[in-house]
Amino acid sequence: KVNYCKIKCLKGGVHTACKYGTSTKPNCGKMVVKAYGLTEAEKQEILKVHNDFRQKVAKGLETRGNPGPQPPAKNMNNLVWNDELANIAQVWASQCNYGHDTCKDTEKYPVGQNIAKRSTTAALFDSPGKLVKMWENEVKDFNPNIEWSKNNLKKTGHYTQMVWAKTKEIGCGSVKYVKDEWYTHYLVCNYGPSGNFRNEKLYEKK
């Protein structure tokens, strides 16, 4: 069993699974939690949206950008699901506190993160695939002709993590809650090894 309190994160701070423990039970105050965690089908959907998009970019079929198209890649692998990443992501999602947690690395590697939430009054929750598409759509603001890190990462940083070539694994956590008649789906995806290292390449261009 991993002692998360002993993990030293690249960015410092106390590990999420030490600070909150490893229980994924929601801690959401006045929000009425309708569901937490992901079904097998939802996990597969998240993986499929990521890998379809990674292959689309790798093949040079992504025409969007500022300017587009995005150049093809020669080292883009498919991501695989990692339960440890998912559990740590779920501990954080279950705090219902929208934002990034500081320390979520594993013994194996530093960990990156994408977050999204969507709220609707339509008494239903958006699918996780819809939330992942929000990250994908940031490609429209991405300029491939300058160094990737010179882009505005507030606008494009989820996209760059999604297609970061050296990332191999993903695990996500989710909470669906209701507050004041708003139905909110909050999704946290953790990636290992982390992307968005300024001195490394997004991917090898073909």
From Swiss-Prot:
Ubl conjugation as UniProt keyword: no
Source superkingdom: Eukaryota
Main localisation: secreted
Keyword tags: Allergen, Disulfide bond, Secreted
Keyword Secreted listed: yes
Annotated family: Belongs to the CRISP family. Venom allergen 5-like subfamily.
Name under which the protein is recorded: Venom allergen 5
Native organism: Vespula vidua
